[in-house]
């Protein structure tokens, strides 16, 4: 027993250093800190982090455009997986820097953290840039980077590798009409690995979003890489109506409550802000979202500009309700107004202040009130000029508010005596552990499967919720249908975390939510409906990694009193072949018609025991792409569903033909 912890002791001794002196202090110079800890600068080394590099370079070109010095930005994706981003702006300065007389300003910008023109209000009134660290981070994390600057009939160019200078600044003659900056780079596989590359669809959508945010810029797009059908080889991207064009491309007109988008574009010299917005309301909340930006940089956590917009909408609607004598508007809250709203908001200000390194939330003071006043003035006019629209909106919001207030009056759910308080038709069998850590909720269909699962579970950590009634397709249902559906009510009450904008992850009662359906086609259909529900109603739950799919077996094979399980036809064939070769004994094959047919011990051993089961984790990597697929496959329009199935069938057929040995 005395040796039981010897390994840990030895390990601990190695870690402790009693001679802590100056030599233990590691000093990283130049761009070394970026290469050593890339996550501190771009948030990681995954695919999303890699695309931050594109954002940084593109934001620099956008700063030139917003400042009025550039009108055209070019993005070209090359076959070698490098990317070139160019603009026709002023071009990065190439004269020697006052603090570094032996270096050009270009070299200083590329090799020094926190350098660049955007820190001076004399150069840019408004500026973006992802982390304020400049193109130097891109240079540090690029396997190769080449920069070209066109100025006054000259071409200046320089090459770098992994942040280190390869060549001196070279000057050549060039046509006088050419001006601006061009950067070509490829991410370093030492940092990001050699299996991920820039995603054309992701970069194309980024380019489109930037063009929407500043209507004065045209982006020339070219892609040499094979991409999905919705990514063109070449395109000119320009949106003269800005965010209104963007919102129009995101919504389905048939679902709108209002026939008109509430939009505006105002520049206030007095307040020092430029504000643009576009808002519409739909019949259900499945497509609701808020996207906000400051100086073309996304602010997913909102901030003071969003606060101003929300106050303007709430004040405007309450004022209109009071004007028309509708007393029920007094109960309105901002969550009622935003429940089914699709909102895009963009603000340009000088010297913005953000929370955190990644600029995800705007915290600049003096922004909220001007934004509120500007938007409210326009909203008041919008409502008073469109009485029919205004009254429809008011009725819609009041209905949502009444539903919210009714739910608020329900008793708080506790684990103790949960079945009585929840009053679930399926009789939730809850676990005894009071904290969410290590707990699991198995969602099954019907009482038969629920009975087997309840007997097979670990009562301390595993809960079982059998859903009764038809699982609703929330992608094609109205908000009224969704909130009145029994299965959805049961599920939302059991999870207790709320949905859509009312989702609170700290209230989620289980660590893992596991969809456990039959292993056949019917089970897959139910699982797809439930996944659609979670994606549209609780996307944050999916993003945070709480949603899983169980993998129950479809077949049971018995040979010589030994039992084996197979998940599908292919696995059954392989297992049969293997057993036939190892023994001549007869193989008996049985097919489970459903989970309810399985004995509790079988269900436990194959599907529910944490150490013996297989789970599929449901993840969200490309939200916009998933959103489109869900809309095509699960939405209201059958022609979209037919087109999706047809395209997938063609892909499958091509694969089969390619695999045929003819």
From Swiss-Prot:
Top-level taxonomic group: Bacteria
Catalytic activity field: ATP-dependent breakage, passage and rejoining of double-stranded DNA
Keyword Iron listed: no
Annotated coiled-coil segments of the chain: none
One Gene Ontology term of the molecular function aspect: metal ion binding
UniProt enzyme class: isomerase
GO process annotations (BP): chromosome segregation; DNA topological change
Boundaries of every Toprim domain copy: 439-553
EC number: 5.6.2.2
Cofactor section: Mg(2+); Mn(2+); Ca(2+)
Binding, Mg(2+) 1: 445, 518
Magnesium in keyword set: yes
SMART domains, per the entry: HATPase_c, TOP2c
UniProt xrefs under Pfam families: DNA_gyraseB (PF00204), DNA_gyraseB_C (PF00986), HATPase_c (PF02518), Toprim (PF01751)
Residues the record lists as binding Mg(2+) 2: 518, 520
UniProt keyword terms in alphabetical order: ATP-binding, DNA-binding, Isomerase, Magnesium, Metal-binding, Nucleotide-binding, Topoisomerase
UniProt remark on cofactor binding: Binds two Mg(2+) per subunit. The magnesium ions form salt bridges with both the protein and the DNA. Can also accept other divalent metal cations, such as Mn(2+) or Ca(2+).
Cellular component terms per the entry's GO annotation: chromosome
Marked site positions, Interaction with DNA: 470, 473, 525, 641
NCBIfam families: parE_Gneg
Family to which the UniProt record says this protein belongs: Belongs to the type II topoisomerase family. ParE type 1 subfamily.
Quaternary structure, from the entry: Heterotetramer composed of ParC and ParE.
Function: Topoisomerase IV is essential for chromosome segregation. It relaxes supercoiled DNA. Performs the decatenation events required during the replication of a circular DNA molecule.
Protein known as: DNA topoisomerase 4 subunit B
Organism: Rickettsia bellii (strain RML369-C)
Gene: parE
């Amino acid at each position: 027993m005395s040796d039981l912890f010897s390994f840990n002791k030895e390990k601990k001794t190695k870690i402790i250093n009693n001679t802590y002196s100056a030599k233990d202090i590691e000093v990283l110079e130049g761009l070394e800190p970026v290469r050593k800890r890339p996550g501190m600068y771009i948030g990681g080394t995954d695919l999303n982090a890699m695309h931050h590099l594109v954002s940084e370079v593109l934001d620099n070109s956008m700063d030139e455009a917003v400042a009025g010095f550039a009108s055209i930005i070019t993005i070209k994706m090359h076959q070698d997986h490098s990317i070139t981003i160019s603009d026709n702006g002023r071009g990065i300065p190439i004269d020697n820097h006052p603090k570094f007389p032996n270096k050009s300003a270009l070299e200083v910008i590329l090799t020094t953290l926190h350098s660049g023109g955007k820190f001076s209000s004399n150069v840019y009134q408004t500026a973006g840039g992802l982390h304020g660290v400049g193109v130097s981070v891109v240079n540090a994390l690029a396997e190769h980077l080449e920069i070209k600057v066109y100025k006054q009939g000259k071409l200046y160019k320089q090459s770098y590798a992994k942040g280190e200078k390869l060549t001196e600044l070279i000057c050549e003659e060039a046509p006088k009409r050419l001006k601006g900056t061009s950067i070509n780079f490829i991410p370093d596989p030492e940092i990001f690995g050699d299996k991920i590359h820039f995603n054309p669809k992701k970069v194309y959508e980024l380019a489109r979003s930037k063009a929407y945010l500043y209507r004065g810029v045209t982006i020339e797009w070219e892609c040499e890489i094979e991409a999905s059908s919705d990514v063109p080889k070449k395109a000119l991207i320009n949106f003269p109506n800005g965010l209104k064009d963007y919102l129009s491309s995101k919504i389905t007109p048939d679902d709108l409550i209002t026939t008109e988008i509430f939009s505006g574009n105002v520049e206030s010299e007095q307040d020092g802000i430029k504000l643009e917005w576009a808002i519409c309301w739909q019949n259900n909340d499945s497509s609701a979202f808020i996207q906000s930006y400051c100086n073309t940089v996304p602010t997913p956590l909102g901030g003071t500009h969003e606060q101003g917009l929300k106050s303007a909408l709430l004040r405007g609607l309450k004022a209109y309700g009071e004007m028309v004598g509708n007393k029920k508007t007094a109960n309105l809250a901002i969550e009622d107004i935003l429940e089914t709203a699709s909102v895009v908001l963009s603000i340009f200000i000088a010297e913005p202040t953000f929370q955190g390194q990644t600029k995800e939330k705007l915290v600049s003071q003096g922004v909220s009130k001007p934004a509120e006043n500007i938007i409210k003035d326009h909203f008041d006019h919008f409502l008073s000029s469109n009485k029919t629209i205004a009254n429809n909106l008011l009725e819609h919001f009041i209905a949502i508010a009444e539903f919210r207030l009714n739910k608020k009056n329900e008793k708080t759910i506790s684990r103790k005596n949960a079945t009585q308080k929840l009053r679930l038709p399926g009789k939730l069998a809850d676990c005894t552990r009071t904290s969410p850590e290590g707990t699991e909720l198995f969602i099954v269909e019907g009482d038969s499967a629920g009975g087997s699962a309840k007997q097979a579970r670990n009562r301390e950590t595993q809960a079982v919720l059998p859903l009764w009634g038809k699982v609703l397709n929330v992608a094609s249902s109205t908000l009224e249908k969704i909130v009145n559906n029994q299965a959805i009510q049961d599920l939302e009450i059991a999870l207790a975390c709320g949905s859509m904008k009312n989702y609170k992850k700290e209230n989620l009662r289980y660590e893992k939510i596991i969809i456990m359906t039959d292993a056949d086609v019917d089970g897959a259909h139910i699982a797809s409906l439930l996944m659609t529900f979670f994606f549209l109603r609780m996307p944050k739950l999916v993003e945070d990694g709480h949603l899983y799919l169980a993998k129950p077996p479809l077949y049971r094979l018995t040979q010589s009193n030994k039992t084996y399980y197979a998940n599908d036809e292919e696995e059954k064939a392989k297992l049969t072949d293997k057993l036939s070769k190892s023994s001549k004994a007869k193989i008996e094959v049985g097919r489970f018609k459903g989970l309810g047919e399985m004995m509790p011990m079988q269900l436990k051993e194959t599907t529910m025991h944490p150490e013996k089961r297989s789970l599929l984790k449901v993840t969200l990597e490309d939200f916009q792409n998933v959103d489109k697929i869900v809309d095509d496959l699960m939405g209201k329009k059958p022609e979209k569903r037919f087109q999706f199935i047809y395209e997938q069938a063609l892909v499958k057929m091509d694969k089969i033909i390619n695999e045929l040995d003819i």
